[in-house]
């Protein structure tokens, strides 16, 4: 929504500077994009946070995985593709094979039908579900409490929902906002390298992470393992793809979701 608003007003106030997160200025149907020089926008690399979660889940022993998103939009799809890539990397190390069901509910608000779908997945063998978008975390919290399954959420730290929510693949808004404001006030404006430009926030500046409660809720995937994995990804010792389309994943990864992908809507 903010991207649409900014698209319309960004040139109306020539003395106002804008900082936009998680979106870019676009028209209502996403057919046109335009960013004025007084606008700087930041897109998180959700696939990186998703990778951490997928790697942790499989290292912990969960190989029958699910992913439920509100809508099939780039940010949520990046969480899904990163989640699968991390799961694949951990499974390859351990000689395991993972399966992933994906489903996009086409709504931002959880309802009984969505919660029941997750309950059915758990009852049919899915061991861990990652949810992304809206308030799906409320639905998965109900589902794990009824079935004994496990979950990982996204965006914010939702581990207070209970021990069955093993962790959250988060965007570190506080760190990202502080860094951007420091850059702005140091120059007094968005300069030529920032004004009208897109910036990606991720491993490089520590602006995505996996949080897993206090005390740490993973057993096999230790905090030392997490720190090592994070550093290997930050320094590009390990590589990953920034896919925002499930249909363009590398073939070996796409094969694991080909038979399980759902795009039904409730």
Located regions from the model:
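A residue-level marker of the well-folded mature domains of exported/periplasmic proteins
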Residues: 1-266
């Amino acid at each position: 929504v903010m991207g649409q608003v900014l698209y319309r007003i960004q040139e109306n106030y020539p003395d106002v500077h804008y900082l936009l997160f998680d979106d870019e200025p676009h028209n209502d149907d996403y057919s046109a994009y335009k960013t004025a020089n007084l606008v700087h926008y930041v897109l998180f690399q959700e696939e990186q946070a998703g990778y951490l979660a997928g790697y942790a889940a499989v290292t912990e022993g969960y190989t029958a995985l699910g992913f439920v998103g509100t809508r099939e939009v780039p940010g949520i799809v990046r969480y899904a593709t990163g989640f699968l890539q991390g799961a694949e990397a951990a499974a390859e190390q351990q000689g395991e094979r993972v399966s992933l069901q994906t489903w996009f509910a086409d709504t931002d608000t959880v309802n009984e039908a969505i919660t029941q779908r997750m309950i059915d997945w758990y009852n049919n063998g899915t061991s861990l579900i990652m949810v992304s978008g809206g308030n799906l975390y409320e639905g998965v919290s109900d589902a794990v409490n009824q079935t004994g399954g496990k979950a990982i959420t996204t965006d914010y730290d939702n581990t207070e929902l209970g021990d069955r929510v093993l962790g959250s693949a988060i965007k570190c808004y506080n760190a990202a906002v502080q860094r951007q404001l420091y850059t702005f006030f140091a120059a007094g404006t968005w300069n030529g390298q920032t004004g009208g430009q897109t910036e990606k926030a991720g491993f490089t500046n520590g602006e995505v992470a996996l949080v897993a409660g206090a005390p740490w809720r993973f057993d096999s995937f230790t905090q030392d393992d997490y720190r090592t994995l994070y550093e290997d990804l930050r320094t590009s010792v390990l590589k990953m793809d920034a896919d925002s389309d499930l249909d363009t994943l590398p073939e070996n990864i796409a094969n694991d979701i080909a038979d399980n992908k759902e795009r039904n809507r409730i």
